[in-house]
Amino acid sequence: MSITPAKKSELISEYKVKDGDTGSAYVQCAILSERIRNLTEHLKVHKKDFHCRRGLMVLVCKRRKGLQYVRNKYGNDAYLDLVKRLGIRDVFH
């Protein structure tokens, strides 16, 4: 359900804004998206894992707030580019 350090460093290198960047909103949204994908796959098998389902909802809300921050801080074009790169739906339009 959690992501491996190798996958996390791969996501960081793919979504970083500059060298040494590990905590920008882009990277955080990418890591949250990967965790959401993993939990979604888990819930397809374990349908009655309600504790996990609540954790998934918390992660989705965190990602939504991060995406909202990107949209407000960097503009709509940067937000739409990030949504497209992550392969998720646009939640604000």
From Swiss-Prot:
Output the superkingdom of the source species: Bacteria
Sum up the protein's function in the record's words: One of the primary rRNA binding proteins, it binds directly to 16S rRNA where it helps nucleate assembly of the platform of the 30S subunit by binding and bridging several RNA helices of the 16S rRNA.
UniProt entry tagged with the keyword Coiled coil: no
Instruction: Give any GO molecular function from the UniProt entry.
Output: structural constituent of ribosome
Keyword Isomerase belongs to the record: no
Assembly: Part of the 30S ribosomal subunit. Forms a bridge to the 50S subunit in the 70S ribosome, contacting the 23S rRNA.
According to UniProt, the name of this protein is Small ribosomal subunit protein uS15
Organism per entry: Anaplasma marginale (strain Florida)
Q: Which UniProt keywords apply?
A: Ribonucleoprotein, Ribosomal protein, RNA-binding, rRNA-binding
Can you list the GO cellular component terms from the UniProt entry? cytosolic small ribosomal subunit
Any GO BP annotation:
translation
UniProt lists the family membership as follows:
Belongs to the universal ribosomal protein uS15 family.
Q: Which NCBIfam families does the record associate with it?
A: S15_bact
Q: Name one Pfam family in it.
A: Ribosomal_S15
